[in-house]
């Protein structure tokens, strides 16, 4: 509980004690009025001050105005009729109790999220003259060597140049299993070093590091509001003035009707009391507070599981997802390619791999990296000239002055060369050297252990269609799709074809159904942007993924996709529960108040009680671990 909350609690206790004491003091008239004004002002002076400031700034209609008018009106009625000021003070007292509870609940939610996302490093260690010096992470330049001791957070992305350790990545991924890290491994900020001392050569500035990107994403998520939140904001804008005018009509019209048409007593006191009760009931706090809190808690609960949502609008869209489109490589498969064999070659296996690795040396594609890994020697780029990358086909280059072509069967066709056809499952890289076909290299990629379970989980979650897009051959694509149980597969696609295919799938679905695209974020930015919702997987260290996607999964587990959808649906379910509950109770109590059945005590429940219940319900969105 912060200082401000403690102050409000103290005022509540003082007001309650004063009311109990006053209950046993038998005074009447103006002295009774003055005595009861003490607890009223103790508990309500800030509300009156805010209401007056709102009137002064021409922002009249808010909950402070409603409470001020209702309580001042109740005091006026009591002053001229029965001298019972208890109800007026009770309205203000319980309103403040509700506000305190709401403030504490929101603070608790924020604290939970900030603890879960407690990855911001306070300092970085730099070795100066053999001694460790703590500096601000912002001051560390690229290429510096920082030292991370056991128990410390890794402050900046880099590469380990000395030492080995285990890393706790739970704040980023939601997974508690430690990861081993050794010399030569890339390491990202936000992890906690658990055992050995690590020396890390930084590859980014702090502002561009993973930890900064994630914190920026989480902090800005509240600015992107959902349709539900925007509706509530607009609703409150028109609702509050409407109920104020309705209360005014309730106070004035019935007495006038009684005088003019019924020749009866106007009963001003009764109708003013009903109007004031009507005002207290109508306060929209439960909706205005609980709806944004539900989304805030939902985003916080998701971040706890390593699912970063860029805004409540994306959480709302995700809940309506009925079709999920996957990229194959790095999403459903490991994306770690290895050379499985060289076939139909006339040259030595090593020579074929050498030519292929050198020709592909300028590419950062995983297949190129696998060829370079199989070659196993340092790449001498001076040996390679005239490199030309042909999109969707492969690469041509000159190695030691000899022309080399490495790519798929389309490249061989383009060059007018006959090639070997095969039904082997894997990525086939055909090789032509000096205008002659020299066989093919088979490169394999393993399916992730949780991919099949992820597809089952999505279908169980009500996803109508699972679709896989890949640039791989039809044989490989069909084999992977069959093994995983994916409904549709489209293979041999060029990068531009994926966007066109997603456009086609978007046109095919229902107007209220949403389509999500899941990729590894490396080459998928256009498709991630085009889908209704873009989900990037394995985004630890990938700036492109964090920038392009609407939702970021911090690790490589495809099971998190179904979990993210379940989290979004739980959050939206809570939003609808709070909306229907708050509006339903208020409508019933408004009718009861207007006809004189509901008194001020029921009005307090309809306002404060409903708000407390709605806030408690909203906080449930934080707890998503068992989904």
Annotate the PLM regions:
Residues 401, 427, 433-577, 585:
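Conserved ATP-binding TGD loop and adjacent catalytic N/P-domain core of P-type ATPases
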Residues 17-34, 53-62, 68-88, 241-280, ...:
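Helix-interface capping motifs at the ends of transmembrane segments in multi-pass membrane proteins
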Residues 2-123, 234, 241:
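Transmembrane helix-loop-helix hairpins at the membrane interface
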Residues 1-14, 45-75, 215-249, 321, ...:
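Soluble-to-membrane junctions at the N-terminal ends of transmembrane alpha-helices
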